[in-house]
A protein has these predicted regions:
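A general secondary-structure junction signal
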Residues: 3, 23, 128-130
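Generic structural motif recognizing short loop/turn segments at the entrances and edges of beta-strands
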Residues: 15-17, 35, 41-44, 77, ...
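C-terminal solvent-exposed extensions
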Residues: 98-160
Length: 160
């Protein structure tokens, strides 16, 4: 498990992550809607975590930004791995203060390179209804058929 405090240091280790900003970020002088920016420092964390004051304030937009960030981060990470074969080990060492794991540095390095080189052409989405409860908290009620499809895709293999 890696906690959210790792976003900034790991983002900056890859030299920043290039994304197009698709939401308004009130109060930010660097995250400007419509601009392509290189996320550095706290801007990276703001981009992936902020919700309430950004765009429509709903979680769906934040999840879309997280997907955009994930794809761009993987590209930057993979590039760094190709430039420096020890880069995954450097990331592992940096993450020590932010993670709890039982995998070794060598295992992490192998997994990190696999993750970075994996094709992100398949995204699974559970459809459903968004709303708010009586206390004003955002809710999501998954469509049962959509949820079942995602479960089958993730956890089962088709027989041939």
């Amino acid at each position: 498990m890696v906690n959210m405090g790792a976003i900034v240091p790991v983002n900056d280790m890859v030299g920043g992550v290039i994304v197009k900003v698709t939401d308004e970020f009130p109060g930010s002088k660097t995250l400007i809607k419509g601009k392509t920016v290189t996320l550095k420092g706290n801007d990276a964390e703001t981009f992936v975590r902020e919700r309430k004051d950004v765009g429509d304030g709903l979680n769906d937009n934040r999840m879309k930004r997280q997907q955009v960030y994930e794809v761009a981060f993987k590209q930057a990470f993979y590039k760094k791995c190709n430039e420096n074969k020890k880069f995954p080990l450097e990331v592992y060492n940096t993450l020590q203060d932010y993670m709890t794991t039982n995998i070794t540095a060598q295992q992490f390095s192998k997994l990190a390179v696999l993750m970075a080189s994996a094709k992100a052409d398949t995204k699974l989405t559970v459809k459903g209804k968004e709303g708010f409860d009586d206390d004003g908290w955002q809710t999501f009620t998954p469509d049962k058929d959509s949820l079942k499809q995602v479960e089958l895709e993730l956890f089962y293999k088709k027989q041939k």
